Swiss-Prot record:
Keywords, comma-separated and alphabetical: Cell inner membrane, Cell membrane, Membrane, NAD, Quinone, Translocase, Transport, Ubiquinone
Lineage, broadest ranks: Bacteria, Pseudomonadati, Pseudomonadota, Alphaproteobacteria, Magnetococcales
Catalytic activities: a quinone + NADH + 5 H(+)(in) = a quinol + NAD(+) + 4 H(+)(out)
Entry protein name: NADH-quinone oxidoreductase subunit D
Primary role: NDH-1 shuttles electrons from NADH, via FMN and iron-sulfur (Fe-S) centers, to quinones in the respiratory chain. The immediate electron acceptor for the enzyme in this species is believed to be ubiquinone. Couples the redox reaction to proton translocation (for every two electrons transferred, four hydrogen ions are translocated across the cytoplasmic membrane), and thus conserves the redox energy in a proton gradient.
PROSITE patterns found in the cross-reference section: COMPLEX1_49K (PS00535)
GO molecular-function terms, A-Z: NAD binding; NADH:ubiquinone reductase (non-electrogenic) activity; quinone binding
Membrane topology type: Peripheral membrane protein
Length: 397
């Protein structure tokens, strides 16, 4: 007698690997998915494939040499990563930053936010099937990369923020280029919203997908757009202002439902608020020095090194030995595009950190995938991962 389906008493779920070689994995993410048909029962993230030992490397480098390693953490938010490191060094060494340098750092922190969020819109749209967003966003992103390059000579690994200020002043004409971009960027955001915000397919793919309540967001340690998307109006730029953020006015956009759609809307509004911040900084910024005048800490100006022996000696000492910080410990955090990036820095009084601990926002967000994905279809996993906006440089470190 042929067997029938009723003869089998047990049906088992099956497991599949999502990534690490997958275009929607946003890096080297490996998810072990347990499926009941097409419904996700469990999603276990496996991390560590991009581990480079950054925290240990920082113990072997001077405080100046440590800055480029932060460019390579979240390599889509380069100057924001540097920001946390230099602020930690400045607080531990009680190093003062000139006012103009504070404004420049604030401007470039917001430009970095644009660069990151534009990539988020582009990649998230591509994950869901909206390829036009990819083309539109890279049009504006290219302008911003040129603005990056004009200030520091690099499009990605900037090494522009330094303890005590920035590497060099803005070249002639760059302030006007930034103003021009801020004048037309809101109309481009309107174009993005025309394409996506009320798009029926976009809303079907994002609304009620990956919902996170306020309580769960706090429990998982969410920060940045992930926390604000769940309705919590917390932003380090307001709560613990640094550089010029206490001198500018801006609002904190928050979501209502805590789903992928709200996280998208929060990032759109963050771009609009970033335009306001940059415009206020440009209006308030005055000519002046852009780095601390103690050349035992800050690099002397290149034109001085060509004429002054003392400046050349300072440069040689900083490049070979760096500078010493007093013994102690400090925690500094900044509001990067992905959330709170924190640096816990311990000094034993030498020219290198005794210990440097990095708190990456994306690590906490990735932990929650197993809860966010449970009960959703397998096609929704790419939406959830995209809405988190993860980069494995900072997660694996």
């Amino acid at each position: 007698m042929p067997a029938t389906i009723t003869d089998h008493k047990e049906f088992q779920n099956y497991a599949i690997n999502f990534g690490p070689q997958h275009p929607a994995a946003h890096g080297v993410l490996r998810l072990l998915l347990e499926l009941d048909g097409e419904v996700v029962e469990r999603a276990d993230p496996h991390v560590g494939l991009l581990h480079r030992g950054t925290e240990k490397l920082l113990e072997q480098k001077t405080y100046i040499q440590g800055t480029p390693y932060f460019d390579r953490l979240d390599y889509m938010s380069m100057m924001s990563e540097e920001h946390a490191w230099v602020i930690a060094v400045e607080r531990l060494g009680q190093i003062e930053v000139p006012e103009r340098a504070q404004y420049i750092r604030t401007i470039y922190a917001e430009i970095t936010r644009f660069i990151n969020h534009l990539l988020f819109f582009a990649a998230h749209g591509l994950d869901v099937g909206a390829m036009t967003m990819f083309l539109y966003c890279f049009r504006e992103r290219e302008e911003l990369m040129d603005i990056y390059e004009a200030a520091c000579g690099a499009r990605m690994h900037a090494n522009y923020f330094r303890p005590g200020g920035v590497a060099r002043d803005l070249p002639d004409g760059l302030e006007q280029r930034i103003r021009d971009f801020c004048n037309h960027f809101p109309s481009k955001l309107d174009e993005y919203e025309t394409l996506l915000t009320n798009n029926r397919i976009w809303k079907q793919r994002l609304v009620d997908i990956g919902k996170v309540s306020q309580e769960d967001a706090f429990s998982w340690g969410f920060t940045g757009p992930m926390l604000r998307g769940s309705g919590v109006a917390f932003d380090l730029r307001k709560a613990e202002p640094y550089d010029a953020y206490d001198r500018v006015e801006f609002d904190i956009p928050v979501g209502k439902n805590g789903d992928s759609y709200d996280r998208y809307l929060v990032r759109i509004e963050e771009c609009r608020e970033g335009v306001k911040i940059i415009q206020q900084c440009l209006d308030q910024m005055q000519p002046g020095p852009v780095r601390n005048d103690n050349f035992k800490i800050s690099m002397p100006y290149r034109q001085d090194m060509q004429q002054d022996m003392e400046s050349m000696i300072h440069h040689f000492k900083l490049c070979t030995e760096g500078f010493n910080l007093p013994a102690g410990e400090v925690y500094a955090a900044v509001e990067t595009p992905k959330g709170e990036l924190g640096v816990y820095l311990v000094s034993d009084g030498g020219n290198k950190p005794y210990r440097a601990r990095i708190r990456a926002a994306g690590f906490n967000h990735l932990q929650a995938v197993k809860e966010m994905a449970r009960g959703h279809m397998i096609a929704d996993v790419t939406t959830i991962i995209g809405s988190i906006d993860i980069v494995f440089g900072e997660i694996d470190r």
